[in-house]
Amino acid sequence: MSDIKKSVIVIGAGVGGVSTAARLAKAGFKVTILEKNDFTGGRCSLIHNDGHRFDQGPSLLLLPRFFHEIFQDLGTSLTAEGVELLKCEPNYNIWFGDGSSFEMSTDLTKMKKAIEAVEGIDGFERYLGFLQESHRHYEVSVESVLRRNFPSILSLARPEVLFNLFNIHPLESIWTRASKYFWTERLRRVFTFGSMYMGMSPFDAPGTYSLLQYTELAEGILYPRGGFHKVVEALVNVGQRLGVEYRLSTGVKSISIDQATGKANGVVLSDGTHLPSDIVISNADLVYTYNNLLPKTSYADSLSKRETSCSSISFYWSASKIVPELNAHNIFLADEYQESFDSIFKEHLIPSEPSFYVNVPSRIDPSAAPEGKDSIVVLVPVGHLLSDSEGTHRGLSKSGNSGGLETSQDWDKMISLARDTVIATMRARIGVDLAPLIENEIINTPFTWQEKFNLDKGAILGLSHSIMNVLAFRPGTQHSKYKNLYFAGASTHPGTGVPVCIAGSKIVAEQILKDSGFKNNQIPWAQDTTKSPKGGLDKMSDSSLTLFQGFLGALVAILLAYYYLVIAAN
């Protein structure tokens, strides 16, 4: 480890960027963050209007251990930084087409009563079995995926990966796994809609992701008082105390490459200024980075063709009065459940009857709205942008019974349709007409997500988390050619979501430190594992282990590819 401070430029002040920057500053690096917008947080930011506050993106704090851990690693705590986490109870109200609802809760007594009302006395026992399985998915994923890097196919041959591969059901969908425990269509829907957190259909999302249902049901849904951005704000403050420099309203035109050394040597700003650095980390959308900030390559083209998550039309409504029928988190499920997901993820369209999420931050935190009023966020999932040969986009179902528009994507009409559908659905199911209560409306469309945050195709959660888009198959945290160029954020390993990006910041920061010559006991937050006794495969020689891992890694890759391309396709 050199005594000379290495300089680091981080592109993008999203969660992954500010987390990685703070960690590297803690280790003594000189870090500068460049952000194109005039605010930090990326999608994890706030929108304000006349006393109303809205979370622009994430509004549910899950996997709290990663939030506590990063502040502990930085020598502080959420409490010390003024972040107060509020528990949302109930978790959700889930509304169905017949006007009935289901209340999700961490309270086992309430869940027992609600589940037995639908599936009888045996239903609760099966629910406990579902919790047991999802708990296993949770613990294995946290320790073997969210805390580990997967730089190559060889990584798939790790003993803990091989041992747990079929225990976490990556080759079955969440819907398939839930159907083994819940016998009614209603409860299957209740316990699978959460795959939307990954931007995926429950009929395609690997069963492993039931870990999200576990963290909600066991740990609860939390919300930072003052908005989700309070967490980002605290990380920014810690970073600044450690020496991180933030330069907002500073766009990056390209990552500069020294052809003589084959390394990144800084960035070129939008105004043409060159900023040098020893290390570059891009927390910008990964597909955007490869296609807009780096020299064009066939790999960049292939990334553009990868499966991505969905987009959304998001409404931010300032309501003139409190709407008591709505809790902090509300889900309205389409009657044609599978068909609505197929419209989004297979046809990349907007469903004629979408499922949608309604967040009322003022219900859990009254400071989100003026007294006597509510702030309401409605997120309607839609297909990501698809450009056709004429440069237009299509996005609304054109099936004969869909009520859709015969259009190459008239977004004004599509937004109007989404708004009308949401208002009509809520009027029918909860008996409240929101239309006359809306004093002000702000809208984010797929184009907003694309233009404001450089999200490829307006996909709000980056690349998909399908089986061939995770672990060693997901774009790596280090560029294959420019070894001092690294990546953070939703589309690299381990994946999307605020806690996952925070977990990823630890992975990439430790990778950078080790590449810079740090030993385990020199990493500020790491325990010294150099004296740990070796056993099992660790006793093998390096060359033997590499060959063994290579064989197993290749075998796993072949089996997964075969399943995905042959069996799943049929």
UniProtKB/Swiss-Prot annotation:
Gene Ontology terms: biological process: carotene biosynthetic process; carotenoid biosynthetic process
Disruption of the gene: reported phenotype: Leads to the lack of coloured carotenoids and the accumulation of phytoene.
Enzyme Commission number(s) of this protein: 1.3.99.-
Principal location class: membrane
UniProt entry keywords in alphabetical sequence: Carotenoid biosynthesis, Membrane, Oxidoreductase, Transmembrane, Transmembrane helix
UniProt subcellular location: Membrane
rRNA-binding in keyword set: no
Protein name: Phytoene desaturase
